[in-house]
């Protein structure tokens, strides 16, 4: 029996390592990684340059709160703004955190910038998956996952055509 909370049925596959875009199980079978950690690990596995940079960073800092200035974070934010439309970057730990932040940013914009207390509706697609927080579940309208008998108001789901 596993001590990992069973949030969904798990596959019998057990991967031991990865290289490039491939995963390997305990028997040495090779699998092309189409899942990418549910679409969050698109960099592949064991790339020499990334391994070197990650090892260098491990010798410096692992994690700091964003209440502190972090030189590497500042450099990356500047670069992202230089090559995009954005003036600011909000770094997140996960897609779910990004969804929660986008919900808050959109609602804050309407409440503060447009001075509207009624414009808070967010449109999303039915059956979409945005994570497992209450806000992400409400945005997705994926009732199969929302077993908490609660929802957050202000979302309109439309069919994806």
Predicted region positions:
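N-terminal glycine-rich, Lys/His-bearing helix-loop that initiates the first secondary-structure elements
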Residues: 1-88
